[in-house]
From Swiss-Prot:
It is found in: Cytoplasm. It comes from Geotalea uraniireducens (strain Rf4) (Geobacter uraniireducens). SUPFAM superfamilies: DTD-like. One of its GO terms (molecular function) is Ser(Gly)-tRNA(Ala) hydrolase activity. Belongs to the DTD family. GO terms for cellular component: cytoplasm. An aminoacyl-tRNA editing enzyme that deacylates mischarged D-aminoacyl-tRNAs. Also deacylates mischarged glycyl-tRNA(Ala), protecting cells against glycine mischarging by AlaRS. Acts via tRNA-based rather than protein-based catalysis; rejects L-amino acids rather than detecting D-amino acids in the active site. By recycling D-aminoacyl-tRNA to D-amino acids and free tRNA molecules, this enzyme counteracts the toxicity associated with the formation of D-aminoacyl-tRNA entities in vivo and helps enforce protein L-homochirality. This is D-aminoacyl-tRNA deacylase. A Gly-cisPro motif from one monomer fits into the active site of the other monomer to allow specific chiral rejection of L-amino acids. The keyword Magnesium does not apply.
Length: 155
């Protein structure tokens, strides 16, 4: 699994001009599921994201987690994170999980994040979505589960 996470002061996602998910202070997660991913990777990623200390404390130091600030999370599925652009001019999506597997792990990740105490809003899986955000910082990180690092997958 791969995720791009952004610290936001607000973020939202629309489908067909209608807002389907929106958060205020928190994290926007763009989540890509790859072949071979399992609930183990989803657990690792959810734990990492909710506990990652990327919010500033009173001294201005990144020392607080999403749990600490009682923030929200907007999860948006994005299969293009599994894209490989190393050859040619058209990305290959050979490593992306099939939709029927990806949706299960995406929904599992969302549920796990809820279990960890974070309110979650979502986009709609496989929909054409318009995502808007105000990146706070800007602060953006790319996370890969340990399994992806071991496989040596790179975009």
């Amino acid at each position: 699994m791969k995720a791009v996470i952004q610290r936001v002061s607000e973020a939202g996602v629309k489908v067909d001009g209608r807002t389907v998910g929106a958060v205020e202070r928190g994290i926007l997660v763009l989540l890509g599921v790859e072949k071979g991913d399992s609930t183990k990777e989803a657990d690792w990623l959810a734990e990492k994201i909710v506990n990652l200390r990327i919010f500033e404390d009173a001294a201005g130091k990144m020392n607080l987690s999403l749990l600490d600030i009682k923030g929200e999370l907007l999860a948006v599925s994005q299969f293009t994170l599994a894209g490989n652009c190393s050859k040619g001019r058209r990305p290959s999506f050979d490593t992306a999980a099939p939709p029927e597997e990806a949706i299960q792990l995406y929904e599992y990740f969302v549920g796990k994040t809820w279990e960890l105490g974070i309110p979650v809003q979502t986009g709609i899986f496989q929909a054409d979505m318009k995502v808007s955000l105000v990146n706070d910082g800007p602060v953006t990180f790319i996370l890969e589960t340990p399994k992806n690092k071991e496989r040596g997958t790179r975009s």
